[in-house]
């Protein structure tokens, strides 16, 4: 079987209206991929930068997959969004903070329900990933 190692980090994020940021992340693959080691989802710590507009996390990513077929790709810069609540929730968010949250993150990955989400664009998250492939020449 072909093997894929992903070693890197979630560097940080910029372009968000607030400075106190964390990142909840996940790697989702097709049925041909199997995770051998590492965590396929997680959450960074919160960073509140004292200077500048970049929140730094340096959150490590270390994954080892095996696959029977080739599919998928990776991104280095990820644009982000957040749920957009009702106008009452938006006003409350302005004065109190917080904001609407998804009841279940599974709605993001199913195309049938995703079209009902109302979202607003936010900043970008930067990743540095090193990819090591083994036995891909056999497939």
Kindly give the residue locations of the regions a language model identified.
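Eukaryotic Ser/Thr- and acidic-rich low-complexity regulatory segments
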Residues: 1-139
């Amino acid at each position: 079987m072909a093997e894929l190692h992903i070693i890197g980090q979630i560097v940080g994020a910029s372009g968000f209206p607030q400075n106190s940021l964390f990142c909840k992340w996940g790697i989702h693959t097709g049925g041909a991929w199997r995770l051998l080691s590492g965590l396929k989802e997680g959450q960074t710590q919160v960073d509140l930068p004292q200077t500048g507009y970049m929140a730094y996390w340096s959150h490590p990513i270390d994954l080892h997959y095996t696959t029977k077929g080739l599919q998928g790709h990776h991104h280095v810069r990820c644009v982000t969004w957040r749920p957009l609540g009702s106008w009452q929730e938006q006003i409350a968010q302005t004065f109190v903070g917080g904001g609407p949250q998804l009841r279940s993150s599974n709605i993001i990955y199913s195309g049938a329900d995703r079209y009902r989400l109302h979202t607003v664009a936010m900043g970008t998250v930067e990743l540095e990933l090193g990819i090591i492939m083994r036995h891909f020449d056999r497939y």
